[in-house]
Amino acid sequence: MKTIFYWSPCLNKVGTVKSTVNSAIALSKYSNKKYKVKIINTCGEWDEYSDVFKKYNIGIIEFKYKFFSYLPKNGFLKSRISYLVIILFSFFPLYSLLKKDKPEFFIMHLLTSLPIILNNLFNFQTKFILRISGFPKLNILRKFLWTSSSKNLFKITCPTKDLLTQLKNQNIFDVSKMFYLQDAIINIQDYIKRIKINEKYFLKKVESYNNYFLAVGRLTKQKNYPYLISEFSNYIKENKKEILLIIGDGEEKDKLNELIEKKN
């Protein structure tokens, strides 16, 4: 049986985590071809999903050390240090895994630099698929890494058509390898199970929030929440009944909380 490995080391429960889980479930359950889907658990970041993976016959590849609970999760610098620790502890285990198991496909969601570098160095007998989420900043290092690895990547997927167009215009990847694939954020079966409320009751609940502005997303620099908070603080000077509700998590959470306290 051919195998598909998922690589998505995560620190917080952001949208990419849900997308990774639902994508793995879909491939395991609905694929026309018989594939064994496995998720790489680098340091214990996927431990809490073990029952879900077992339910859908998704395998878990365990690396030796479990240190996820000790890693700092919030703050830009702290989260970068945590990712660096994961890279250092995963370099040789991931190399050995790819060399020994030779999966048919290797899908990368987060912390993609490590598998990309390994593939550039050793050219494994595996089709590497790069999943690009959000609108990543194309700094010099990232652009160089992507450009140099383009020939070694099997496919590159983008969650939005805007991102796909932007990357095509940058001439970083082979255009024939790129395509649009939406994030698997919603598991339809779970969604149906959770909708147990009466339609009228639901509408009443929504109407009670008509003074709210809602912002949902990962709390990162790319989303520019400081600008939203600053502008809204000016807006409520004349509209005091209005409330901004931000739902999300990420490395900028602490900084945003400090800014909100300052503006209040």
Pin down the residues of each PLM region.
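Short His-centered aromatic/hydrophobic patch
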Residues: 86-90, 107-114, 132
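A conserved, positively charged/aromatic
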Residues: 78, 82, 98, 128-158, ...
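Glycosyltransferase donor-sugar binding loop
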Residues: 39-47, 185, 216-222, 243-256
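A short helix/loop element that forms part of the nucleotide-sugar donor recognition site in Leloir-type
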Residues: 190-207, 212
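A conserved mid-protein helix/loop that constitutes part of the nucleotide-sugar donor-binding site
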Residues: 14-25, 211, 215-234, 251-257
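Nucleotide-activated donor-binding/catalytic signature segment of Leloir-type glycosyltransferases, i.e.
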Residues: 57-59, 257-264
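N-terminal strand-loop element at the rim of the active site
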Residues: 6-14, 18, 26-81, 168-171, ...
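Donor nucleotide-sugar binding/catalytic pocket of nucleotide-sugar-dependent glycosyltransferases
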Residues: 61, 151-196
